């Protein structure tokens, strides 16, 4: 059933691999001096300083430096600390930290001070922190009012589905090394019975999941919308073809962090669900959960008014509140546009022909605000740089370019940020780091500076990176790939220490599949590790274990909950902040 993996049953047995490192020597200064921002001369122009050899052989006594001996030493700082080898190492490391800080936060004093505070708070965490780390965090409680005037949606409730129901089957899943058990469709299973410190659920949804999205809310009850493809298959239709058919969107409810159940199911005839995204505001109406943007394989974007308590469990959506599409292209992705001031009523979409379109839902015009060429091929992702740069947007496409543009003038203020040798399937914006998290060469997760000055490696895999997720409450990046593994990484461990410091990769779980036995095995309890230095090979994994989407919960008090959707139909939601550790 796949390669054996090293496991640990007790999460409290985690150890920090860098306990023996001299990390305490690298301390960021509060104010940068002129010496800190000077560029050092190459090491070959410096005068070599003799040091004491720490070997069993006969020691060599080092001579103290004199003012005359320090002449011609290039641009080395002329301070008392620089007269010793240890002091010089500290100074060089400090400059490396300041350089990385400037690459991420720029030269503005306020941004630099904010970055220093965040680094000091988060740089010591190698795994997901406990719930106490999220206390004091604030969330955006903007109200959803402007979209409540829409009244074009038609819902049909029925007790018995007059159409065909999806043919779903039980999945044989073994958790850890226990014997396999049959998981029935839409029946949550608690895989952490033997470990009361952890909290989470595993569900057989019965559909090949492709998108998950948490509902923004300020209440204790959480809602999760999940959607998937039309059928279970290793191959799918071309993304440039319009396809339609009966599909469903499931809505799951999490109550008091202990009860997870299916609330209701929305049926539609729009084909495979490519993307689900809730409007990032809170509804003021008790009868409405929120507005859900849905991109399907028929090439259209729809906005659904999701009711809080429908009359029946099965609901068929005959017509949406808002439908947007083109005749000459397919809509491939979307994102809600959050303005600096005012309510949210605009949606930015990417198309299969490389065009971008901005649509105002409240506008009486039937055409978008702009429809401009931007990429040379299918646009796969559109991301807004919230909260510090709400006017900037990032896009990735099948032309292997990552571009950035200003929505206030997208025709002039746009430029390519990077060009990769392979398609970038996912990209996300980390506001705490003020940097871009994306995949490179299919297998690597990298940090790209918004200013285009540096790139740092976060994680490497044997499979293609499919999905990345960030949170506004913590800096941890969730990574999902075709190898069936979900990991989280703390990028602040790269900024808070020296150049040699690497970020620990914490494997949350690993899904394996046996074709011979037609059963799955889900492993967890892994110890955080450092990324491998050797070059990794690309493997072809069974399509059933591919993790198509990971999503952090963006609500206050639930920021540690992570949802993962897999191609075999398994949905896993887990509270990674349940264990208090550091």
From Swiss-Prot:
CC annotations in GO: chromatin; cytosol; nucleus; transcription factor TFIIIC complex
Swiss-Prot/TrEMBL keywords: DNA-binding, Nucleus, Repeat, Transcription, Transcription regulation, WD repeat
Gene Ontology terms for molecular function: RNA polymerase III general transcription initiation factor activity; tDNA binding
Keyword check for Protease: no
InterPro entries according to UniProt: GTF3C_component, WD40/YVTN_repeat-like_dom_sf, WD40_repeat_dom_sf
Repeat region (WD), residues: 221-262, 268-314, 326-369
Renumbered residue ranges of the record's region Disordered: 1-97
Name of the featured protein: Transcription factor tau subunit sfc6
Record gene name: sfc6
């Amino acid at each position: 059933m796949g390669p054996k993996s090293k496991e640990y049953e007790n999460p409290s047995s985690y150890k920090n691999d860098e306990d023996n490192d001299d990390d305490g020597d690298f301390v960021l200064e509060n104010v940068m001096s002129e010496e800190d921002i000077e560029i050092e001369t190459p090491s070959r122009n410096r005068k070599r300083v003799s040091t004491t050899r720490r070997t069993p052989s006969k020691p060599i006594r080092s001579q103290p430096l004199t003012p005359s001996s320090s002449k011609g030493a290039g641009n080395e700082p002329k301070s008392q600390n620089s007269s010793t080898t240890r002091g010089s190492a500290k100074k060089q490391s400090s400059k490396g930290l300041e350089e990385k800080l400037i690459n991420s936060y720029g030269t503005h004093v306020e941004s630099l001070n904010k970055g220093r505070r965040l680094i000091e708070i988060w740089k010591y965490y190698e795994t997901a922190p406990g719930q106490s780390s999220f206390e004091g965090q604030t969330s955006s409680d903007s109200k959803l009012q402007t979209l409540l005037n829409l009244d074009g949606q038609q819902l049909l409730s029925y007790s018995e589905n007059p159409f065909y129901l999806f043919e779903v089957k039980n999945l044989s899943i073994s958790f850890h090394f226990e014997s396999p058990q049959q998981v029935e469709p839409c029946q949550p299973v608690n895989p952490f019975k033997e470990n009361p410190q952890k909290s989470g659920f595993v569900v057989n949804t019965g559909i090949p999941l492709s998108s998950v999205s948490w509902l923004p809310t300020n209440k204790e009850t959480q809602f999760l919308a999940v959607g998937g493809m039309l059928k279970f298959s290793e191959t799918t239709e071309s993304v440039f073809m319009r396809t339609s058919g009966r599909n469903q969107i499931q809505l799951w409810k999490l109550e008091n962090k202990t009860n997870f159940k299916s609330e209701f199911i929305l049926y539609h005839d729009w084909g495979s669900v490519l993307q689900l995204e809730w409007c990032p505001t809170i509804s003021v109406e008790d009868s409405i959960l929120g507005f859900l943007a849905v991109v399907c394989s028929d090439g259209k974007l729809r906005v659904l008014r999701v009711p809080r308590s429908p009359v029946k469990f099965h609901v068929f959506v005959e017509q949406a509140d808002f439908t947007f599409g083109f005749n000459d292209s397919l809509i491939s992705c979307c994102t809600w546009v959050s303005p600096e001031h005012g309510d949210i009523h605009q949606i930015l979409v990417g198309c299969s022909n490389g065009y971008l379109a901005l649509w105002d839902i409240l506008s009486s015009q039937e055409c978008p605000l702009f429809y401009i060429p931007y990429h040379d091929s299918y646009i796969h992702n559109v991301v807004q740089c919230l909260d510090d740069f709400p006017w900037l947007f990032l896009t990735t496409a099948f032309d292997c370019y990552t571009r950035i543009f200003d929505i206030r003038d997208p025709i002039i203020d746009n430029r390519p940020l990077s060009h990769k040798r392979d398609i970038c399937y996912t990209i996300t914006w980390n506001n705490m780091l003020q940097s871009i998290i994306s995949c490179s060469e299919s297998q690597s997760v990298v940090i790209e500076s918004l200013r285009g000055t540096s790139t740092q490696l976060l994680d490497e895999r044997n499979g293609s990176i499919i999905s990345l997720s960030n949170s506004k409450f913590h800096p941890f990046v969730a990574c999902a790939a075709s190898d069936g593994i979900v990991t989280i990484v703390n990028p602040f461990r790269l900024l808070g220490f020296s150049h040699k410091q690497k970020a620990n990769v914490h494997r949350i779980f690993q899904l394996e599949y046996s074709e011979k036995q037609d059963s799955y095995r889900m492993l967890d309890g892994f110890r955080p590790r450092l990324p491998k230095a050797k070059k990794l090979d690309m493997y072809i994994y069974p399509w059933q274990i591919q993790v198509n989407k990971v999503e952090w919960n963006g609500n206050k008090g639930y920021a540690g909950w992570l949802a993962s959707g897999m191609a075999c139909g398994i949905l896993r939601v887990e509270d990674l902040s349940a264990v208090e550790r550091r």
